[in-house]
Amino acid sequence: MRAVLIEKSDDTQSVSVTELAEDQLPEGDVLVDVAYSTLNYKDALAITGKAPVVRRFPMVPGIDFTGTVAQSSHADFKPGDRVILNGWGVGEKHWGGLAERARVRGDWLVPLPAPLDLRQAAMIGTAGYTAMLCVLALERHGVVPGNGEIVVSGAAGGVGSVATTLLAAKGYEVAAVTGRASEAEYLRGLGAASVIDRNELTGKVRPLGQERWAGGIDVAGSTVLANMLSMMKYRGVVAACGLAAGMDLPASVAPFILRGMTLAGVDSVMCPKTDRLAAWARLASDLDPAKLEEMTTELPFSEVIETAPKFLDGTVRGRIVIPVTP
């Protein structure tokens, strides 16, 4: 079976597209014929070796996939079932989706919800699923469309594109943040009410800035998140799910104790299955298939390795889906 394989010898990492035998797959109670995988920021870090994402070598990357069950000893799945996998350390500690077959734990799988097909579910992928977890976090904390604008950082990326689309479809006014002025038309096409230059959120952080937004979804961390927090309206809510700008957070407690705001952490990797099912049900019902197509690029399997560095220099738009099985 064809696979992307990351290997390490001493301190040198190498990545190749190679052929593997099925008996090399790790343990698991479900064997899946992978139809589609995707390329995410974490996959790019793994493939390029720019961060210690991979915990075991050799490793097949790919933090998500969609496909059809080939064999199963798990009570919830049988051959022929169509399934989705996101997270659970797949592509980091357990071989992932950038291979024609994957053997995983059935507890990690989610049944494909109607009316999505396998390609659409992959187009949504971990980025879209994470975006929905963020939207659900805002809703859970009482943020409604009438409260004011919702700011979304990294809006032209995978999480940001889906978040912008989902929020706009529900009637929220979205302020889309991007470092690429050329993406303004794309973002407005997804439903953004306004487009903000990222530089507005990368400057010096004040304990309290001007009250601008009722809520936010942040993929960046660092000064971007800190500035976002300082500019929330009274009882605003920010859902944080990424660290593209850095793991630090140079903020103060002022927005929390003077404006009563909430910072909601969103983890898509170890998220409980009940929350996953809820997120995927909403994605199946709320996300416009036409908008999903608009934000997605299909990439040949053979180009995965050479494309990964583009994530790290910020030139990737939206989602990248990879047909795995020829």
Swiss-Prot record:
<comment type="function">
    <text>Catalyzes the NADPH-dependent reduction of acrylyl-CoA to propanoyl-CoA. Is essential for growth with 3-hydroxypropanoate as a sole carbon source. Restores acrylate resistance when expressed in the E.coli strain K12 acuI deletion.</text>
</comment>
<dbReference type="InterPro" id="IPR020843">
    <property type="entry name" value="PKS_ER"/>
</dbReference>
<feature type="binding site">
    <location>
        <begin position="156"/>
        <end position="159"/>
    </location>
    <ligand>
        <name>NADP(+)</name>
    </ligand>
</feature>
<feature type="binding site">
    <location>
        <position position="257"/>
    </location>
    <ligand>
        <name>NADP(+)</name>
    </ligand>
</feature>
<dbReference type="InterPro" id="IPR051397">
    <property type="entry name" value="Zn-ADH-like_protein"/>
</dbReference>
<dbReference type="Pfam" id="PF00107">
    <property type="entry name" value="ADH_zinc_N"/>
</dbReference>
<keyword id="KW-0521">NADP</keyword>
<feature type="binding site">
    <location>
        <position position="243"/>
    </location>
    <ligand>
        <name>NADP(+)</name>
    </ligand>
</feature>
<keyword id="KW-0560">Oxidoreductase</keyword>
<comment type="similarity">
    <text>Belongs to the zinc-containing alcohol dehydrogenase family. Acrylyl-CoA reductase subfamily.</text>
</comment>
<dbReference type="InterPro" id="IPR013149">
    <property type="entry name" value="ADH-like_C"/>
</dbReference>
<dbReference type="GO" id="GO:0043957">
    <property type="term" value="F:acryloyl-CoA reductase (NADPH) activity"/>
</dbReference>
<dbReference type="InterPro" id="IPR036291">
    <property type="entry name" value="NAD(P)-bd_dom_sf"/>
</dbReference>
<feature type="binding site">
    <location>
        <begin position="178"/>
        <end position="180"/>
    </location>
    <ligand>
        <name>NADP(+)</name>
    </ligand>
</feature>
<comment type="subunit">
    <text>Homodimer.</text>
</comment>
<dbReference type="InterPro" id="IPR011032">
    <property type="entry name" value="GroES-like_sf"/>
</dbReference>
<keyword id="KW-0963">Cytoplasm</keyword>
<dbReference type="GO" id="GO:0005737">
    <property type="term" value="C:cytoplasm"/>
</dbReference>
<feature type="binding site">
    <location>
        <position position="198"/>
    </location>
    <ligand>
        <name>NADP(+)</name>
    </ligand>
</feature>
<protein>
    <recommendedName>
        <fullName>Acrylyl-CoA reductase AcuI</fullName>
        <ecNumber>1.3.1.84</ecNumber>
    </recommendedName>
</protein>
<dbReference type="Pfam" id="PF08240">
    <property type="entry name" value="ADH_N"/>
</dbReference>
<dbReference type="InterPro" id="IPR014188">
    <property type="entry name" value="Acrylyl-CoA_reductase_AcuI"/>
</dbReference>
<feature type="binding site">
    <location>
        <position position="268"/>
    </location>
    <ligand>
        <name>NADP(+)</name>
    </ligand>
</feature>
<feature type="binding site">
    <location>
        <position position="41"/>
    </location>
    <ligand>
        <name>NADP(+)</name>
    </ligand>
</feature>
<dbReference type="InterPro" id="IPR013154">
    <property type="entry name" value="ADH-like_N"/>
</dbReference>
